[in-house]
């Protein structure tokens, strides 16, 4: 203790903070945590179908983000294992990856729900809320992993911890925090894989397994196209093994590539994507995030083995590295589009495309402004792809007009802006190229050179 001389206090003796202060601080922090998670956990008592589809992507995103700052790593491998508990018949979901160890901050961010680093442009995470979505499987989750045990990130230890987020009221959630802390165990030895284990006991959780795996199968090839960090992904669904492997990319032209993904399992197939990209320094992004930032965009179309375009109507075609599941109710366009710089809503189900584009008070671009700015760079990519496909006479080019006949109504979409600055732009580009296959055998024509005959419903049914 030492005397403190202050003209307002006289001479006082400083003492350590009273123990009651520390205990009160812990209680307040616990209540702040409850405030942070309670609403979302309550929503997940009756999860939406989109929630049930998203859990696998949230886990893949977390795995990918573990190497965002690790200069010694550029790829990870993932295993998803679905099995039955032989003792009680419950389903067990195990998600494994061999990414980098947790930092102390990242581990606590996962356990206490906050996003560690939105400013890192290599990190896909936005809000720290995504992992909560995985609780549509189960609100009790056991984690086995490794963490750096020193600030210099030179030493590693293993750990296990079980999250208990199954409480109904605040006091039960706080009790779950106590149980979580008591479950923590640290080891000198490390684990080969980071593993998240969910014991699924409810019908809703079993439905989440079903919808999540269906969405996984539909979108994993596109995700691997845009997420170069994924070297391989293996799904073991009760002994039925599916492996997705990236094949070497083929350079078709100076800026057009072909990427293929071999899917092996009960049936074998190869999914093929023709794609191009844009990456340039962006002043507005750099100013907003106080760091040198590039705007990055990928645009792709899927083609089959006969070089016909694949229909993407009604599918998830927008990616912020991971698929923005649910965005199909807002946007329907001719391309599969990815940008790590997209600004989605908090549940990653739509893009923010309404409201002001510039924050005058802070003198920075808004989330809406960023998304609109990304669109300006999509159209040159669309033009390159349409030209390549038309020049090489790919089939079913009418899919390049997908979504261009109408605009969806959505609360986060400025309908008038979207029609003038998106739909009309796509149409202008499409009119420039020979994309219509004439029925008289005279080859491909520009749309303005064609006469379109509207067939009756009966004629269409007969074809």
Q: Residue ranges of each PLM-predicted region?
A:
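Eukaryotic intrinsically disordered and solvent-exposed regulatory patches
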Residues: 43, 66, 127-129, 182-183
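Alpha-helix N-cap/helix-initiation motif
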Residues: 45-49, 119-127, 367
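Flexible ATP-lid and adjacent glycine-rich G1/G2 motifs of the Bergerat
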Residues: 95-152
């Amino acid at each position: 203790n030492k005397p403190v001389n202050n003209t307002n206090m006289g001479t006082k003796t400083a003492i350590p903070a009273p123990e009651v202060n520390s205990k009160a601080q812990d209680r307040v922090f616990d209540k702040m945590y409850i405030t942070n998670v309670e609403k979302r956990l309550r929503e997940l008592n009756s999860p939406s179908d989109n929630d049930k589809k998203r859990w696998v992507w949230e886990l893949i995103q977390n795995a990918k983000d573990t190497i965002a700052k690790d200069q010694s790593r550029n790829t990870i491998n993932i295993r998803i294992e679905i099995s039955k508990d032989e003792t009680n018949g419950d389903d067990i979901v195990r998600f494994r990856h061999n990414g980098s160890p947790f930092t102390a901050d990242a581990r606590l961010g996962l356990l206490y729900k906050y996003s560690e680093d939105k400013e890192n442009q290599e990190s896909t995470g936005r809000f720290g809320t995504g992992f909560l979505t995985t609780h549509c499987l189960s609100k009790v989750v056991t984690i086995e992993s490794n963490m750096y045990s020193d600030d210099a990130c030179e030493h590693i230890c293993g750990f296990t911890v079980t999250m208990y987020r199954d409480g109904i009221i605040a006091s039960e959630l706080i009790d779950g925090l106590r149980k979580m802390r008591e479950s923590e165990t640290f080891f000198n030895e490390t684990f080969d894989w980071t593993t998240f284990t969910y014991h699924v006991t409810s019908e809703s959780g079993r439905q989440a397994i079903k919808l999540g795996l269906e969405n996984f199968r539909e979108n994993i090839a596109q995700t691997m196209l845009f997420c170069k960090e994924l070297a391989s992904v293996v799904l073991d669904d009760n002994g039925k093994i599916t492996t997705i492997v990236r094949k070497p990319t083929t350079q078709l032209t100076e800026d057009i590539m072909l990427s293929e993904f071999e899917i092996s399992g009960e049936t074998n197939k190869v999914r093929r994507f023709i794609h191009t990209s844009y990456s340039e320094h962006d002043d507005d992004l750099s100013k907003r995030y106080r760091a040198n930032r590039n705007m990055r965009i990928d645009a792709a179309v899927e083609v089959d083995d006969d070089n016909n375009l694949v229909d993407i109507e009604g599918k998830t075609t927008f990616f912020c590295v991971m698929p923005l599941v649910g965005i199909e109710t807002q946007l329907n366009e001719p391309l599969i589009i990815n940008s790590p710089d997209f600004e989605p809503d908090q549940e990653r189900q739509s893009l923010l495309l309404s409201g002001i584009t510039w924050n005058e008070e802070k003198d920075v671009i808004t989330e809406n402004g960023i998304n609109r700015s990304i669109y300006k760079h999509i159209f040159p990519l669309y033009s390159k792809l349409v030209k390549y496909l038309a020049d090489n006479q790919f089939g079913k080019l009418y899919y390049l007009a997908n979504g261009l006949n109408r605009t969806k109504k959505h609360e986060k979409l400025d309908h008038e802006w979207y029609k003038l600055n998106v739909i009309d732009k796509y149409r202008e580009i499409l009119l420039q190229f020979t994309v219509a296959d004439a029925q008289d055998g005279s080859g491909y024509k520009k749309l303005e050179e064609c006469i379109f005959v509207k067939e009756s419903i009966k004629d269409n049914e007969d074809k």
